[in-house]
From Swiss-Prot:
Residues 1-31 form the signal peptide. GO terms for biological process: anaerobic electron transport chain; nitrate assimilation. This is Cytochrome c-552. Heme binds at residues 148, 151-152. Pfam families: Cytochrom_C552 (PF02335). It is an enzyme of class 1 (oxidoreductase). Heme c 2 binds at residues 186, 189-190, 319. The keyword Nucleotide-binding does not apply. Keywords: Calcium, Electron transport, Heme, Iron, Metal-binding, Oxidoreductase, Periplasm, Signal, Transport. GO terms for cellular component: outer membrane-bounded periplasmic space. The gene is nrfA. Pathway: Nitrogen metabolism; nitrate reduction (assimilation). Its cofactor is Ca(2+); heme c.
């Protein structure tokens, strides 16, 4: 019995010894692999091929030192991704939802509004949109200030350094056409020398300062969202100098921004049909995302829109900034264990429900504008219309704040539904008050509304000569833009053929 026990113990000892040797061998391989990968990473950063100058805006200059990041950045030119709700291709939103033409009567967005493409298209899309007009063609001047360039190019910080921030904003859009030529890229988010994340646009820094906050104390994880917040926010052009300003002084909710604008008696345009003083929301992506569960749990923009890629011993951020639905295995499924199909269904469900409210709001708001026009024509007084125009202004602000934000119905579905529902209530209230005004003026029938069921019909109704606008834009693209490109190349500002 004792001999048998000794044999068992001996056998067990050899098993333990052999297992230990295998474990030690595997640990050795792992240590060697880790050391090799660390050496590979250190080699990449220690042996940079090119010295990059401060304010270097040419994205191609970063390719030698950061080939992986550069290559994935070039994929932002790809427009093949599709989802149930748009994707990375330019879609004519006015064609899909012609009521928006009515909302923007008297404003450039009624001419042209498409869903955004990737960052590499930023300059080209700015030049092509009808919203920037055709300066220099048949004596036409600028429709927009140079402030419109601020979020389109890493040339912007370079020019701000060269001529000053105030002077940059004061310029006309076309005056910087040969200087703002490289699309959104490296220097917008990175210090060219250290490649640390940095804030290159003064408006975000100034917004923090006015709230008593120091943006330089932000953590690296916070910076992975704040570099996006330089542009993906609500803003306006303040005063005669068109100074880019974020309306965050009173807080970062929709109501806070509205209160800021109301106290400043600010409006973007007077609606040519209803005569309401309208606010045009930009794209309050950052503000709205802060109301969502992901941001509240510390998830950054880059975590989902720039997921990590491992290549050999290198882990780097994918600079193909796009919808997380395009790479769900590297975005959603790094935290969530459900299938892609289930997760995609969850996203679409949130978007569909928000869009139900949005569609109701758009129908009511369009009628409110048209019925207000009818009331004016029937002799309504300014005193009678003032509270109605306030409802319309509030309704459209809530609509625009909700729909202008990219991905809002996913980032913060409860907040977006709240905002849109609030806007719907105000549009309906405006229509009720219009009916009362009309009744006082002896009109009690249903208001006859024009046929604005298509983009073409709506644009014709508000008085746009679309054939002329397109013709002049074509002349602009054929004559003015090539001169900008030639001049930029002559100054050494542009490398790639564009």
């Amino acid at each position: 019995m004792k001999n048998k026990e000794r044999k068992l113990k001996s056998w067990q000892g050899w098993l333990i010894f052999s297992s230990s040797m295998v474990v030690v061998f595997c640990l050795g391989l792992l240590a060697a692999s880790v050391t090799e990968r660390r050496a590979e990473i250190q080699s990449i950063y220690a042996n940079k091929k090119d010295k990059i100058a401060p304010f270097e805006a040419r994205n191609e200059m970063y390719r030698g030192n950061y080939p992986r990041e550069y290559e994935t950045w070039t994929y932002t030119a790809d427009t093949s991704f599709r989802s149930e709700f748009n994707g990375s291709q330019a879609i004519d939103v006015l064609e899909q939802r012609p009521n928006m033409v009515i909302f923007w009567a008297g404003y450039a967005f009624s001419r042209d509004y498409t869903s955004p493409r990737g960052h590499m298209h930023a300059i080209q899309d700015m030049q092509r949109t009808l919203r920037t007009g055709n300066p220099g063609i048949d004596g036409a001047g600028d429709m927009q200030p140079a402030t419109c360039w601020v979020c389109k190019s890493p040339d912007v910080p370079r020019m701000m350094q060269a001529i000053g921030v105030d002077e940059f904003y004061k310029n006309k859009w076309s005056s910087l056409g040969s200087d703002i030529v490289n699309p959104i890229g490296c220097a917008d988010c990175h210090d060219p020398e250290t490649m640390d994340l940095h804030i290159s646009r003064p408006a975000l820094i100034e917004a923090f300062q006015r709230r008593g906050l120091d943006i330089t104390k932000a953590s690296h994880q916070e910076m992975r969202s704040l570099v996006c917040a330089q542009c993906h926010v609500e803003y306006y052009f303040k005063g005669e100098g068109k100074y880019l300003t974020f309306p965050w002084d009173k807080g970062m909710t929709m109501e806070d921004a509205e209160r800021y604008y109301d106290e400043a008696e600010y409006y973007d345009y007077i609606h040519t049909l209803s005569r309401a003083p309208i606010l045009k929301a930009q794209h309050p992506d950052f503000e709205i995302s802060q109301h969502g569960i992901h941001a509240q749990r510390g998830v950054s923009c880059a975590d989902c829109h720039m997921p990590y890629i491992s290549e050999g011993g290198v882990k780097f951020s994918d600079h193909h900034i796009t919808s997380p639905l395009a790479h769900m295995d590297r975005t959603c499924q790094t935290c969530h264990r459900e299938s892609e199909e289930e997760l995609r269904k969850n996203v679409y469900e949130r978007q569909r429900k928000a869009n139900e409210v949005r569609n109701q709001l758009e129908n009511e708001l369009a009628k409110a504008h048209l019925e207000a026009q009818f009331a004016w024509d029937k002799g309504a007084t300014e005193k009678e219309m003032t509270p109605i125009l306030k409802y319309i202004r509030q309704s459209q602000w809530r609509w625009d704040y909700g729909v202008a934000s990219h991905g809002a119905s996913f980032h913060a579905p409860q907040e977006i539904t709240r905002i849109l529902s609030n806007g719907l209530e105000r549009a309906m209230q405006a229509r009720i008050e219009i009916a009362r005004v009309l009744a006082r003026h002896g009109y009690t029938d249903e208001v006859p509304l024009p046929d604005v069921s298509t983009k073409e019909k709506a644009q014709k109704y508000i008085g746009l000569d679309m054939d002329g606008l397109h013709k002049n834009k074509e002349k602009f693209l054929e004559t003015v833009v090539p001169k900008w490109v030639k001049k930029a190349k002559g100054k050494g500002l542009l490398i790639a053929a564009k």
